[in-house]
Every structure is written in structure tokens, then in C-alpha cells.
Amino acid sequence: MIKNRKEDLPIVILKENVLFPNITLWVTFDNEYVINSIAQSMLEERLILFAYSNEPNCDESDRGVVKNLCSVGTYSKLIQVIKISKDVIKVLVECQSRVLIDSVSKKNDYLRAKVTFVPDSSGLNRELFTYSKFLKETYEAYRNSLSLKSYDADNEPINYFENPSKLVDIIASNSNLENSIKLELLQELNVKTRIEKLIVNLSIEIDLLDLKKDINSKVRAKLDKGQRDYFLSEQVKEIQKRLGKDENDYIDRLNSKDIPEDVKSKIEKEISRLSKMQMNSPDANIIRSYIELILDLPWNENTVMKNHLSEIEFILRNSHYGMDEAKEKIINFLAVYQINSKVKAPILCLVGPPGIGKTSLVESIARSLSREFVKISLGGLRDEAEIRGHRRTYVGSLPGVFISAMKRSGKSNPVILLDEIDKINSSYKGNPESALLEVLDPEQNYKFIDHYLEIPYDLSNVLFVTTANSLNGMSKPLLDRMEIIKVEGYSYIEKLEIAKIFLIPSIIKESFLDKVYIRIEDDVIFNLIRNYTMESGVRGLKRVLTNLIRRLVRELLYEYSKDQIIKGNFYSPSSLIHGNNSLFTHDPDIPGIYKIININNYYNYVDTEDNLDLIKIDSSGFVYGLAWTNYGGTVLPVEATKFEKKGDIILTGSLGAIMKESAQLAYSIVKTYSSKLNFDVKESPEIHLHFPEGATPKDGPSAGITIATAIASILSDKKVPLDLAMTGEVTLKGFVLPVGGIKEKVLAAYRNGISKVILPKDNKKDYSKLPEEVKDNIDVKFVSSLEEVFDYLNII
């Protein structure tokens, strides 16, 4: 070591440990100043000084701490740093030598010190050899007094017998001496004096340990059997007292909650049972979990409605586009709720195709009411115990989804979404739909009993909202408990507005393009809606727009750096406003990054258009029908051909029983027009009807007039216009009956470029609810009989 060598390095002040040179060990730190010093050391050469204060209650942030530092510190090197948590680190330290602290200064949020290295004699002369030998013997006696049979092989004192300085440091580090004594040994620079002090202190410790052993042996010898029993009894009481800490906590929590008296009495009995059990008993763990669940549940802890009715209405109407009927029913209920807070909430069921925002609407409802929101997915649920919970006698039993949801919400009046209630399945484990009847009945759910709880729990303050794609197959008792709100798909204009107001801004924000000026023209969005998505909702549109923005990001990264895109102040927010013909308009005088996507360049950012065009066959016997599915409306082509031989009707295309009956019925009706269609009923030709997309099951009565028209068209050899579609059920006498799903069906026709639609006359009221945009672009013919259809198409 170079004599009088000096260095400037970060400093850490230790309060509880004394680190001796020649030792490698792990040290844990949780102090901000210490962590900052270690971080600075890692940025330099990993060297650091461990210093010690004469005042045990010193604080690194105290300016006067410098004056109280010991003159000698430990010069060390950081080998490894592990982050345990946000404010805790674990450091592997190699302590190397003693140094004298010349000065300490504060740098921002850590301390630095200037130090001078002091030579530490490691030579072995006869005198030091004798001292070292005596120290080793004293240390062996000290270990025997502690009943230590082995110690760390790496720090074995005998390994450093020829280096007295290392020997004394390692023995001092391995001993249980007080920190004040260890600090005195660290400060001592003379090796001989250091050994003398350590021998004296170890000898004192040996005497104290031997005296303690002697006293204990004499006391134990005097304890008779009765005294030993009393001693053991007191130990058991102390253990039980310590274990009873949980019991006291449970009692305090129980008294702090507004729990019904019968429930409180039951829990007190469970707590009493728990206190008499062994801590690790399986039954004790079951009871403990049960008690904690009861205490974690909200009991009469309601969220107060903070917003006024007008504010709630504003939030609902501005946070979600469309679904006016659902919003109206919620607002009507809240109007009554503000007058009478004990009114029972309705059970709403939003029915509609996927991707139209049913789930996000429920989230908006919870937000407007300032209530907690919890979602329960019921799709694929087939075990009744998932609803009612498992009885506690079963291993691994758990409460049902509703009790778990209440625990997660932490409030007694959350908004709970029951998603995809139509996809619940029955199994040998029971019918979950039957279990839902109690939950969704306002007359019963105030005392809902979960099998795990075994006590009534009040769900009457919960606002339940369910969603479904279809009501087909759902039990009538369950439907009877809910207010059904049918939510239809969106028109082009509605999708355009949703894209401009919600989708594009959210995608831009998620892509960190807030500081980039992006304009996507309306023509581009319209083209994406028409040619890339044929859906009732907007999920497909969001995917297309997301892919467009991603390609835009890739293009930007070729031209600009990441920091320019994310952090650059490219425009003033006031320069962006909503325009009529584009998403945003921009002041050209403001500098920045511009990306304008118009009808001429948008194809650079999207995939090749999918072939979504309808099948078009310009011949007689080909007609478009309109159908409703769980995913919205669709256009259903129907093909008919005839054979000269006499026969009946042949049906293909994966048809259900109702649709097959409709086809038989339609052919019978058409036969009544045999004279006008120029064929002999007695020689009725064989007709083959085919419905394309044969892998897709089709059923329902609404294709009646479509099938009849296709048969009449092939028999009369007259074509039906390819820009026309129809829907309606027919009777044996030729009357046209109303059908459901009019909005979805007409929207499907509009999406597919159909300009004329034939509808039952009794569906006028449904047609009137369609957006003006759709009604302005489609000509509708309302009919009450099949003859009107044939006359309109000039078939007869």
C-alpha cells in the first residue's frame, strides 16, 4: 500500500454494524441517503467508505453529523447489489482496510469523504506471535463457552495465524461483543494494542458466560417436579397469550363493523373455537379463513351518490355513444333513487351483438354513480357451486362468485356486471341458472345464503347489469326477473362518430403519439368501415385502425427518433379542433410532425381488402333474404332451381327444423298461384333450394317470403333485382307476419349496399327507430301479403 495515499469517495454512515477489514459479508440497507451513496459508488469504481458516528441516533440528513464521526472508517468495495424492494437493497461488501477520514462534504442527496490510507503492519515477530497464540486460545475458550462447535471455514482464524492484523479483525468480527467495544477495536491502529484489548474483552465475556451457566444449573437443580410443572404451565399460558393476538384483532374488527347481531354472535363463537385450537391445526386454518372472509366483507358500507342527476346524465351521454334506451332506464331509476334511497334497483339485461360496447356502458354507469365496478364472467359456467359457493366441509372450499365479488368491491352497493349470461351451461353438477334466480330476484336477494358463509348476506343494494348476445335458450323464470334492453348494431355514421370521438384518440394515446399531428380523413374511415368490417359493433374497426396506427408508428421511427415522437412539443393543444370533414384540422404555421392519411395513401397502412362482397347471381330463382344472428344482422342468399320431372322440394344448406317447415309451407303457398305462374299443380316440378355457406346452421321462420319469392321466380323465370332484400314470415293463406331484429337486418342490408328492402307492414314501428342516415338511403316496401310481394316484383 502506498504511504499517505489519498482518495475521494462516497460515504455510508453505519449505526448498528461495525465492519472490520479482511471480511466479506452481506449488508442490508433501507435508508435513502445510504442507497444514494451506494448508487453513486456503482457509477464510479464501486469503492465506498463505511464510517461510524459517536452518536447512535445520528441521521445522515443532519448537517452536524460530520462533526460526530469517528476518525477511522472502513475502506470497502461493492461486489454485488440486489434490490429487495422499492426502498430496500442488499449489498455484498468486501472490506479491505482502515482509513483516516480527513473531511466530509454533502453532494446533493449523498455524502462524500476524503480519506488517507494508513499502513497496517502485517509482519509477525516473536512478540506478536505470542500474542496471536494467546488470542487464538482465548477465542477457542470463548467458543466453547458459547457451545460453538464450528464456524465459517472462510473466516477460520487459524488461516490467518501468520498475519496478526487479519487474525484480530476476523475474531472481533465473529464475536458477540457490543458495538461500542468493536468500534474501539476498529479505531485502534496499533496491532499489539488491538490484540490486548480483544483478549481482555473476550476473557470478560468468558467469565460472564461461565457464571450464567453455573447459575442456571443451580437453579434447575433446585426445581422440584411441582415447580417444573408450574414453569411449564406458565410457558403454555404465555404461548397461548401470544397466539391469542389474532383473537383480539378479530374481536376489535368485529366490533368496528355494522354487522347484524345474529351474524356477530356466530362469528364470536367461531373466534372462541379458534382460541382453543392448536395454531397449526387444519381446522384452525379453515376457521381463520372463514372469520377473515366475514370481516373482509362490506356490511352496510354504501358508496354515497355524489353526482346530481343532471351530472350523471351528462356523464352517461358523453362517455358512450348510442344505447339511449339503456341510459334512459338507468336515469329513470336514479331519479326515483334520489327521492327514496331504499328503492330496489332493476336487474338490467343488455342484449345485442358483440363489440357494440355493452361492457363499457356498464363501466360508465358505475363511474357516473361513483360506485365500485366488478365484472363476473359467466361464459362457460356449468357448476352451481360457483354461484352458491362450496360447503366448508370440503377440502379447499371457497365462497361463490358473488360473495367474492362483494369482497373485492369493498362496498355494499357496487355495480356488478354479469357478462355473457346466455352462455351458462348445465351439467351433472347442477344448473347455475337456477342458482341465479335467487341472486337476481329483488324480493329474495336481501338474504342471499352462500353455502360457504352459511349466513344471510344482503345483495339488495347491488345494481346488477347482465349482458347477452341472444335470449335463445335462456330459462323463462330467469328472463322474467330482468328488464330486457335490446341493443342494436351501429350504422356507418354512428361508427364514423365512434371512431373519431373514441377509437382513434384512444389508439393514438396508447401509441404515445399525443405530440404528433395525425389526421385521418372521413373518406378513409368510411372506406375502412365498408370494405374491411362487416360487423354490428366496432371491434373489427378498432383492429383495423390499430394496425393502421402501428404502421404509422413504424414509418415515423424511420424518420424521427423516439424522443422526438414522444417528448417533442410539436403543437399547441389549442391548434387541434374537431372538423366536419376530417378528424382534426391544424394551423400550418405551427411547426411539428404531420401525418395526413387520405383516400389516396391509406392503402399503404392497411392490409389488402378482404373479399366481403355478397354472392351475386343474375338469374331467376336467386333472392336475398335478411337474417338475424347472435352477432347482428346478415344478408342471406337463397338459390332455387327446378327440374322438369314431377317431384317435391329439396333443401340443402344446414337448415333447422323451423326453416324446413317454412320452405314446405312456401312451396304450398306458391302452388296456389299456379295459374299465374303457368304450371300445373298436378305436375308440380321438383324444386331444389340451397342456402350458401352450408357449414353455418340456419333456422327461423323469417325467411318465409324469401323462399316463396325464390320458388316463384324460378317457376316464372323472372329475375329479382340484386339490390333488393326481404324478410317476413308467411302463413298458409299467404299473409306476411312481423318478425324480430328489424334494425339489425336493415343495417346489414345497408352495409352490403342493398338499396331496397321488403318488410312486413306490422314492422313499421321498428323501422321508424332506424337512424335517418339509413332510412334516407334505403327504399322500403311494407307488405301484408305474399301477393303484394309478387306484384311489387312483377312476378305474377
Swiss-Prot record:
What top-tier enzyme class does this entry carry?
A: hydrolase
Catalytic residues as annotated in Swiss-Prot or TrEMBL: 702, 745
Q: Where is the Lon proteolytic domain?
A: 617-796
Residues involved in ATP binding: 352-359
| Keywords, sorted A to Z | ATP-binding, Cytoplasm, Hydrolase, Nucleotide-binding, Protease, Serine protease, Stress response
Q: What is this protein called?
A: Lon protease 2
Q: Which reaction does it catalyse?
A: Hydrolysis of proteins in presence of ATP
Q: Which organism is it from?
A: Borreliella burgdorferi (strain ATCC 35210 / DSM 4680 / CIP 102532 / B31) (Borrelia burgdorferi)
E.C. number, please?
A: 3.4.21.53
